[in-house]
Design a protein with these regions (language model features):
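Membrane-interfacial amphipathic/re-entrant helices at transmembrane-helix boundaries
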Residues: 1-19, 31, 45, 54-66
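Hydrophobic core segments of alpha-helical transmembrane domains in multi-pass membrane transport
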Residues: 18-19, 43-47, 104-108, 149-161, ...
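Short, non-helical or kinked segments that cap or interrupt transmembrane helices
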Residues: 24-45, 64, 86-99, 171, ...
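Alpha-helical transmembrane segments within multi-pass membrane transporters and channels
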Residues: 57-106
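Transmembrane helix-bundle core of multi-pass membrane transporters
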Residues: 103-165, 266-278, 303-313
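Helix-loop-helix "hairpin" substructures at the membrane interface of multi-pass membrane proteins
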Residues: 141-220, 244, 248
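Cytosolic-side transmembrane-helix boundaries in multi-pass membrane proteins
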Residues: 159, 177-191, 263-313
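Transmembrane alpha-helical segments in multi-pass inner-membrane proteins
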Residues: 219-284
Length: 313
Protein backbone atom coordinates (compact mmCIF):
# COMPACT_ATOMS: atom_id res chain seq x y z
CA UNK A 1 0.00 0.00 0.00
CA UNK A 2 2.87 2.37 0.82
CA UNK A 3 4.33 1.81 -2.62
CA UNK A 4 0.96 2.50 -4.26
CA UNK A 5 0.63 5.82 -2.41
CA UNK A 6 4.23 6.74 -3.24
CA UNK A 7 3.84 6.04 -6.95
CA UNK A 8 0.42 7.71 -7.07
CA UNK A 9 1.80 10.93 -5.59
CA UNK A 10 4.87 11.08 -7.81
CA UNK A 11 2.97 10.28 -11.02
CA UNK A 12 0.27 12.77 -10.02
CA UNK A 13 3.02 15.35 -9.45
CA UNK A 14 4.31 14.85 -12.99
CA UNK A 15 0.85 15.07 -14.53
CA UNK A 16 -0.14 18.11 -12.49
CA UNK A 17 3.00 20.07 -13.38
CA UNK A 18 2.74 19.36 -17.10
CA UNK A 19 -1.03 19.92 -17.18
CA UNK A 20 -0.57 23.27 -15.41
CA UNK A 21 1.95 24.16 -18.10
CA UNK A 22 -0.56 23.33 -20.80
CA UNK A 23 -3.15 25.35 -18.89
CA UNK A 24 -1.05 28.53 -18.99
CA UNK A 25 -0.38 28.12 -22.70
CA UNK A 26 -4.02 27.51 -23.58
CA UNK A 27 -5.26 30.34 -21.37
CA UNK A 28 -3.08 32.61 -23.49
CA UNK A 29 -4.67 31.19 -26.67
CA UNK A 30 -1.95 28.76 -27.82
CA UNK A 31 -2.64 25.02 -27.93
CA UNK A 32 0.42 23.15 -26.71
CA UNK A 33 0.27 19.60 -28.07
CA UNK A 34 4.07 19.46 -27.77
CA UNK A 35 4.15 18.81 -24.02
CA UNK A 36 5.55 15.32 -24.58
CA UNK A 37 8.56 16.67 -26.47
CA UNK A 38 9.07 19.45 -23.93
CA UNK A 39 9.06 16.87 -21.13
CA UNK A 40 11.73 14.83 -22.90
CA UNK A 41 13.97 17.86 -23.39
CA UNK A 42 13.46 19.00 -19.80
CA UNK A 43 14.31 15.49 -18.63
CA UNK A 44 17.43 15.58 -20.81
CA UNK A 45 18.56 18.87 -19.31
CA UNK A 46 18.02 17.58 -15.79
CA UNK A 47 19.69 14.23 -16.46
CA UNK A 48 22.79 15.86 -17.96
CA UNK A 49 22.94 18.30 -15.04
CA UNK A 50 22.81 15.38 -12.60
CA UNK A 51 25.52 13.61 -14.60
CA UNK A 52 28.00 16.48 -14.96
CA UNK A 53 27.57 18.70 -11.88
CA UNK A 54 30.19 17.57 -9.32
CA UNK A 55 28.86 15.33 -6.55
CA UNK A 56 30.66 17.53 -4.01
CA UNK A 57 28.24 20.39 -4.73
CA UNK A 58 26.10 21.24 -1.65
CA UNK A 59 22.69 19.55 -1.78
CA UNK A 60 20.51 22.65 -1.97
CA UNK A 61 22.74 24.19 -4.67
CA UNK A 62 22.66 20.93 -6.65
CA UNK A 63 18.87 20.79 -6.34
CA UNK A 64 18.47 24.36 -7.61
CA UNK A 65 20.93 23.92 -10.50
CA UNK A 66 19.27 20.73 -11.72
CA UNK A 67 15.78 22.25 -11.52
CA UNK A 68 16.90 25.45 -13.27
CA UNK A 69 18.53 23.46 -16.06
CA UNK A 70 15.34 21.49 -16.73
CA UNK A 71 13.21 24.63 -16.59
CA UNK A 72 15.47 26.61 -18.93
CA UNK A 73 15.78 23.78 -21.46
CA UNK A 74 12.00 23.36 -21.46
CA UNK A 75 11.50 27.09 -22.00
CA UNK A 76 14.01 27.28 -24.85
CA UNK A 77 12.46 24.26 -26.57
CA UNK A 78 8.95 25.70 -26.18
CA UNK A 79 10.10 28.78 -28.10
CA UNK A 80 9.90 26.68 -31.28
CA UNK A 81 6.15 26.53 -30.69
CA UNK A 82 5.99 30.19 -29.71
CA UNK A 83 7.80 31.50 -32.77
CA UNK A 84 5.99 29.21 -35.23
CA UNK A 85 2.49 29.63 -33.79
CA UNK A 86 2.57 33.25 -32.62
CA UNK A 87 4.98 34.95 -35.02
CA UNK A 88 4.31 32.91 -38.17
CA UNK A 89 0.69 31.87 -37.47
CA UNK A 90 1.51 28.19 -38.11
CA UNK A 91 -1.01 25.47 -37.30
CA UNK A 92 -0.50 24.90 -33.58
CA UNK A 93 -1.46 21.23 -33.61
CA UNK A 94 1.04 20.44 -36.37
CA UNK A 95 3.80 22.39 -34.65
CA UNK A 96 3.12 20.60 -31.36
CA UNK A 97 3.21 17.22 -33.08
CA UNK A 98 6.53 18.14 -34.70
CA UNK A 99 7.93 19.12 -31.28
CA UNK A 100 6.96 15.72 -29.88
CA UNK A 101 8.82 13.93 -32.66
CA UNK A 102 11.80 16.28 -32.55
CA UNK A 103 12.14 16.20 -28.76
CA UNK A 104 12.78 12.48 -28.46
CA UNK A 105 14.92 12.34 -31.60
CA UNK A 106 17.08 15.29 -30.52
CA UNK A 107 17.53 13.83 -27.03
CA UNK A 108 18.70 10.49 -28.43
CA UNK A 109 21.17 12.17 -30.82
CA UNK A 110 22.60 14.40 -28.07
CA UNK A 111 22.97 11.61 -25.51
CA UNK A 112 24.57 9.23 -28.01
CA UNK A 113 27.03 11.93 -29.08
CA UNK A 114 28.03 12.50 -25.44
CA UNK A 115 28.34 8.78 -24.73
CA UNK A 116 30.43 8.14 -27.84
CA UNK A 117 32.71 11.07 -26.97
CA UNK A 118 33.32 9.48 -23.56
CA UNK A 119 33.57 5.91 -24.85
CA UNK A 120 33.53 5.09 -28.60
CA UNK A 121 31.97 1.69 -27.86
CA UNK A 122 29.02 3.19 -25.99
CA UNK A 123 26.31 4.05 -28.53
CA UNK A 124 23.42 3.85 -26.07
CA UNK A 125 20.97 6.68 -25.39
CA UNK A 126 21.19 6.16 -21.61
CA UNK A 127 22.21 8.75 -19.03
CA UNK A 128 23.24 7.51 -15.56
CA UNK A 129 22.68 9.85 -12.59
CA UNK A 130 22.55 7.49 -9.61
CA UNK A 131 24.22 9.67 -6.97
CA UNK A 132 22.73 13.07 -7.82
CA UNK A 133 19.18 11.70 -7.78
CA UNK A 134 19.33 11.30 -4.00
CA UNK A 135 19.15 15.08 -3.51
CA UNK A 136 15.42 14.92 -4.34
CA UNK A 137 14.57 12.07 -1.98
CA UNK A 138 13.96 11.69 1.76
CA UNK A 139 13.27 8.35 3.42
CA UNK A 140 10.37 8.42 5.89
CA UNK A 141 10.14 4.84 7.12
CA UNK A 142 9.19 2.75 4.09
CA UNK A 143 7.96 5.84 2.25
CA UNK A 144 10.31 7.56 -0.20
CA UNK A 145 9.32 11.22 -0.12
CA UNK A 146 10.22 13.27 -3.18
CA UNK A 147 10.55 17.03 -2.62
CA UNK A 148 8.73 17.59 -5.91
CA UNK A 149 5.53 16.35 -4.24
CA UNK A 150 5.60 19.45 -2.04
CA UNK A 151 6.70 21.66 -4.92
CA UNK A 152 3.65 20.61 -6.96
CA UNK A 153 1.23 21.59 -4.18
CA UNK A 154 2.86 25.02 -4.10
CA UNK A 155 2.69 25.21 -7.91
CA UNK A 156 -1.06 24.47 -7.90
CA UNK A 157 -1.72 27.17 -5.32
CA UNK A 158 0.56 29.66 -7.10
CA UNK A 159 -1.06 28.92 -10.47
CA UNK A 160 -4.53 29.56 -9.07
CA UNK A 161 -3.44 32.86 -7.53
CA UNK A 162 -1.53 33.99 -10.63
CA UNK A 163 -4.28 33.13 -13.12
CA UNK A 164 -7.27 34.49 -11.22
CA UNK A 165 -5.97 37.00 -8.68
CA UNK A 166 -3.25 38.96 -10.48
CA UNK A 167 -3.22 41.52 -13.28
CA UNK A 168 -0.85 39.30 -15.29
CA UNK A 169 -3.15 36.27 -15.03
CA UNK A 170 -6.29 38.18 -15.92
CA UNK A 171 -4.55 39.68 -18.95
CA UNK A 172 -3.31 36.23 -19.98
CA UNK A 173 -6.82 34.78 -19.77
CA UNK A 174 -8.22 37.74 -21.69
CA UNK A 175 -5.86 36.97 -24.57
CA UNK A 176 -7.19 33.42 -24.69
CA UNK A 177 -10.84 34.46 -24.55
CA UNK A 178 -11.00 37.55 -26.78
CA UNK A 179 -7.59 38.78 -27.94
CA UNK A 180 -9.04 41.66 -29.99
CA UNK A 181 -10.77 43.06 -26.91
CA UNK A 182 -7.57 42.64 -24.90
CA UNK A 183 -5.60 44.47 -27.58
CA UNK A 184 -8.12 47.31 -27.65
CA UNK A 185 -7.33 48.15 -24.01
CA UNK A 186 -3.57 48.15 -24.56
CA UNK A 187 -2.65 44.55 -23.70
CA UNK A 188 0.08 43.11 -25.95
CA UNK A 189 -1.44 39.82 -27.11
CA UNK A 190 1.83 38.63 -28.63
CA UNK A 191 3.78 39.20 -25.40
CA UNK A 192 1.14 37.49 -23.27
CA UNK A 193 1.02 34.49 -25.58
CA UNK A 194 4.80 34.19 -25.52
CA UNK A 195 4.63 34.38 -21.72
CA UNK A 196 2.04 31.59 -21.64
CA UNK A 197 4.13 29.36 -23.91
CA UNK A 198 7.32 30.00 -21.90
CA UNK A 199 5.60 29.17 -18.60
CA UNK A 200 4.25 26.05 -20.28
CA UNK A 201 7.78 25.11 -21.33
CA UNK A 202 9.14 25.72 -17.83
CA UNK A 203 6.53 23.53 -16.12
CA UNK A 204 6.69 20.88 -18.86
CA UNK A 205 10.48 20.68 -18.60
CA UNK A 206 10.25 20.40 -14.82
CA UNK A 207 7.64 17.67 -15.21
CA UNK A 208 10.09 15.72 -17.38
CA UNK A 209 12.70 15.94 -14.62
CA UNK A 210 10.23 14.73 -12.00
CA UNK A 211 9.29 11.82 -14.26
CA UNK A 212 12.81 10.45 -14.61
CA UNK A 213 13.59 10.90 -10.90
CA UNK A 214 10.54 8.76 -10.12
CA UNK A 215 12.17 5.71 -11.69
CA UNK A 216 15.57 4.09 -11.65
CA UNK A 217 18.88 5.95 -11.45
CA UNK A 218 19.35 6.09 -15.21
CA UNK A 219 17.17 6.86 -18.19
CA UNK A 220 17.13 5.56 -21.74
CA UNK A 221 15.91 8.46 -23.86
CA UNK A 222 14.72 6.22 -26.68
CA UNK A 223 11.81 5.42 -24.36
CA UNK A 224 10.65 9.04 -24.18
CA UNK A 225 8.25 9.69 -21.30
CA UNK A 226 5.67 6.97 -22.01
CA UNK A 227 2.91 9.27 -23.24
CA UNK A 228 2.76 11.36 -20.06
CA UNK A 229 2.56 14.55 -22.11
CA UNK A 230 -0.66 13.33 -23.71
CA UNK A 231 -2.02 12.10 -20.37
CA UNK A 232 -1.34 15.59 -19.01
CA UNK A 233 -3.50 17.04 -21.79
CA UNK A 234 -6.32 14.72 -20.69
CA UNK A 235 -5.80 15.83 -17.08
CA UNK A 236 -5.97 19.48 -18.16
CA UNK A 237 -9.23 18.96 -20.06
CA UNK A 238 -10.74 16.84 -17.26
CA UNK A 239 -9.77 19.60 -14.82
CA UNK A 240 -11.48 22.16 -17.07
CA UNK A 241 -8.38 24.36 -17.28
CA UNK A 242 -8.60 25.21 -13.55
CA UNK A 243 -5.58 24.69 -11.29
CA UNK A 244 -7.22 22.98 -8.30
CA UNK A 245 -9.34 20.71 -10.51
CA UNK A 246 -6.20 19.78 -12.44
CA UNK A 247 -4.53 18.72 -9.18
CA UNK A 248 -7.47 16.46 -8.30
CA UNK A 249 -7.62 15.01 -11.82
CA UNK A 250 -3.89 14.31 -11.67
CA UNK A 251 -4.40 12.25 -8.50
CA UNK A 252 -7.01 10.11 -10.27
CA UNK A 253 -4.86 9.47 -13.33
CA UNK A 254 -1.77 9.06 -11.16
CA UNK A 255 -3.53 6.35 -9.15
CA UNK A 256 -4.33 4.27 -12.23
CA UNK A 257 -0.81 4.76 -13.58
CA UNK A 258 0.65 3.69 -10.23
CA UNK A 259 -1.63 0.66 -10.12
CA UNK A 260 -0.02 -0.66 -13.29
CA UNK A 261 3.34 -0.63 -11.47
CA UNK A 262 2.37 -2.26 -8.18
CA UNK A 263 -0.73 -4.39 -8.83
CA UNK A 264 1.29 -7.57 -8.19
CA UNK A 265 1.39 -6.58 -4.50
CA UNK A 266 -2.41 -6.88 -4.18
CA UNK A 267 -3.65 -10.47 -3.91
CA UNK A 268 -7.23 -9.75 -5.14
CA UNK A 269 -5.86 -8.18 -8.34
CA UNK A 270 -3.39 -11.00 -8.89
CA UNK A 271 -6.23 -13.52 -8.39
CA UNK A 272 -8.07 -11.97 -11.34
CA UNK A 273 -5.23 -13.22 -13.57
CA UNK A 274 -5.57 -10.28 -15.92
CA UNK A 275 -2.68 -9.66 -18.31
CA UNK A 276 -0.16 -7.05 -17.16
CA UNK A 277 -0.68 -5.15 -20.42
CA UNK A 278 -4.26 -4.40 -19.32
CA UNK A 279 -3.02 -2.63 -16.20
CA UNK A 280 -0.50 -0.71 -18.31
CA UNK A 281 -3.35 0.41 -20.56
CA UNK A 282 -5.58 1.56 -17.68
CA UNK A 283 -4.62 5.26 -17.52
CA UNK A 284 -4.98 5.62 -21.29
CA UNK A 285 -8.33 3.81 -21.33
CA UNK A 286 -9.54 6.03 -18.51
CA UNK A 287 -8.43 9.13 -20.41
CA UNK A 288 -10.43 8.06 -23.48
CA UNK A 289 -13.53 7.38 -21.39
CA UNK A 290 -13.23 10.66 -19.51
CA UNK A 291 -12.71 12.73 -22.66
CA UNK A 292 -15.63 11.02 -24.39
CA UNK A 293 -17.99 11.99 -21.56
CA UNK A 294 -16.81 15.55 -20.89
CA UNK A 295 -15.85 16.73 -24.37
CA UNK A 296 -19.31 18.19 -25.01
CA UNK A 297 -19.29 20.11 -21.73
CA UNK A 298 -15.68 21.28 -21.68
CA UNK A 299 -15.14 25.03 -21.50
CA UNK A 300 -11.85 25.68 -23.21
CA UNK A 301 -10.62 29.25 -23.75
CA UNK A 302 -12.62 30.56 -26.71
CA UNK A 303 -9.67 31.79 -28.78
CA UNK A 304 -7.31 28.87 -28.17
CA UNK A 305 -5.69 27.61 -31.35
CA UNK A 306 -6.74 30.70 -33.34
CA UNK A 307 -3.82 32.79 -34.65
CA UNK A 308 -4.16 36.39 -33.59
CA UNK A 309 -4.85 38.84 -36.40
CA UNK A 310 -4.44 42.41 -35.18
CA UNK A 311 -6.62 43.73 -37.99
CA UNK A 312 -9.57 41.44 -37.19
CA UNK A 313 -12.41 42.63 -34.97
Amino acid sequence: MTLLVQYTLIFASVLALVALGGCFSEHSGVINIGLEGIMVMGALGGALAMKFIPASTPGIVLFILIVLTSVLVGMVFSLFLGVAAIHFNADQTLVGTALNLMGTAAAVVIVRAINVAENPDNVSSTVVYRQAKQVFLVKIGDFEFNWFMLLVVLAIIASHVVLYKTKFGLRLCACGEHPQAADSVGISVYKMRYAGVLISGALGGLGGLVYITAGVSEWKFENGVAGFGFLALAVMIFGQWRSVNIGLAALLFGFFRALSNVYTGFAPLVALKLPSSLYNMLPYIISLIVLAFISQKSRAPKAEGIPYDKGQR
